[in-house]
Structure formats: C-alpha cells, structure tokens
C-alpha cells in the first residue's frame, strides 16, 4: 500500500555512480512510498514497482541549465497531477535548484541531500555558489552524508541539517582472498587524485587495477602505454557488481583524493576486509583511522602515498590486521540505518 508520493530530482540509471546507488538503495527499501524520479535519461529496465522514471530532455553542452528548466516544467505537472507529498533532491545543482523552485512555486516541503562535491566544490566556485545557496536556503531539511559536509555549511543552515551516512551492500561485499593487486575505484578527474596515484605507483613492482572513467582517462592511458607500465591495468567503467568482484579480491584499496565529502568507496573496501590507503582530506578522516583500519597519506604528495603503499605491499600481516579492523568498522554503515533516517525525515515533513 502506497502511503506517500515523493518527487525526486536525481541522477539515476543508466548513469553508474554513488548517487545512483544511494537512490536505488532508498527506493527498493521504501516500498510503501511511490517515487517519481526526474533524471537525465529514462531507464526502461526499471525493476521497482514503486518507481516511475521521468525522462528530462537536456542539451549536452548546457546539461545543467537545460535540465533545470525542463525538470521544473515536468515536476510541476507531476506534483499537480499526482498529489506529490514532498520533494527530495539529490545534489545541489541542478537537482536541488529544481526542488527549491518547485517548493517556492507550489508550497511543498523540500529535502536536499548533499553528496559531497556539491558542498566542497560547487559552494566555493564563482559560478556555482549562487545555485548552492539557492538550493540550500530553500530546503526544509538538508541531509549530509558526513559530518564533514555538514560542517561546510553556513551557520544559519546547520540547524536544519542532519547527518545520515550511506550504507554498504554487505550481500556482495565480502572477502574472497588476496590476489596480489592494489585497486583504485573512482572517476578519472583531478578531485579523485588518480594522477597522483599514477605518479606514486609508476615504479612499484606490484600489480594495480584502476576502475573508472573521466576527462583524465585518455591522458593517463597514453602515459601508461608510452612508459610501458604493464603493471598498471586500466579497466574503464564497470558495473557495481563488477567493482565488488575486484574489491573482494584486491590486496588493498587506494583512495588518493584531493577532496572528498565522505568516500563511501573506502567503507566498501573495508566491508571486504581490505585495508585502505587514503589521503588526509575531508570526510575520509571520519572513516580511515590511521594504523587501525588503514593508512593516511598527505594530500597531493605522491612520495608519501608511495611509502604507504610499499608499507602494505611488504607487510602481509599488517594488511590482514587492518583489513579485519576495517571489516568491524564497516558494520556501522548499513542501508537499513540510512533508510530509517530518511523515512523519519519524510514523516516529519509530511505531517
């Protein structure tokens, strides 16, 4: 029985990434709530009966603004025709701005979830700060996926902000052994520090597998080929199930980010009993406890990162100990807890 209807401006399938996985884990566990998802491209293979996907036309060159305009028009019609109870936007721009516009036009409660780079990059950019401010100030509740993200908010917004951590899919995240390779999972963009990782591992006699895609991919691929770095394998974009398979087998996970709102990939690695080497930035400090469940390296420092990687390569017993501690630590993060927190927010705002 459907007890509530939610309009959800968000990234969703066919796009693979943290926000998509977050949204999927919400909708499949909140079966008594009907979700109308406004996304860039329709996903015809939707398997959830409580989910209706609405395709938002957009121009690739002006993706954000064109989505904002068209999602607002489509969202307004859905709210008026379907009797929507509240709006839950994922990411500040353009999705959060769509939710904010609809809230002001139709007087409907608006929840905004900040996932990381919107609070860390958009908020501080010349072009993005206006959109970030509009989305956050026109939200009744702001959900932050880490304490670090909440602390980035202006003081006048913190009273409406709460922290609800993401969960991990424990069904497919477990230890399958140590197959002697280091793993990176993330976008090939400057923020994720993949270029720092390449600099750190180019001379290390150990195998590394890098999963992801992005604007730095071609540059890194050319560097790997030109320098005959056969120990570095670029695997491109993979499905979450494929990523999980590599995580279960790796020796350790490397998260060399320049900025990170939370770093869910680190928790996923820990759920597989893998030690994590991460940079000392943002929300990663809430997850990776140096010497307990992983090792912390200094930001933008390939030499320090290299030292930490070599420390794990040369000490199998340390890998095992850190991995076991990480497994225990990862139990704090469950989708059940996350969904319970989101449901509570929905109930508070729909009363």
Curated annotation (Swiss-Prot):
EC number: 2.4.-.-
EC class of the enzyme, as a word: transferase
InterPro entries in the record: Glyco_trans_1, Glyco_trans_4-like_N, Glycosyltransferase_grp1
MF (Gene Ontology): glycosyltransferase activity
Top-rank lineage group of the source organism: Archaea
Keywords per UniProt: Glycosyltransferase, Transferase
Any Pfam family: Glycos_transf_1
Family note: Belongs to the glycosyltransferase group 1 family. Glycosyltransferase 4 subfamily.
Protein name per Swiss-Prot or TrEMBL: Uncharacterized glycosyltransferase MJ1178
Species of origin: Methanocaldococcus jannaschii (strain ATCC 43067 / DSM 2661 / JAL-1 / JCM 10045 / NBRC 100440) (Methanococcus jannaschii)
Taxonomic path: Archaea, Methanobacteriati, Methanobacteriota, Methanomada group, Methanococci
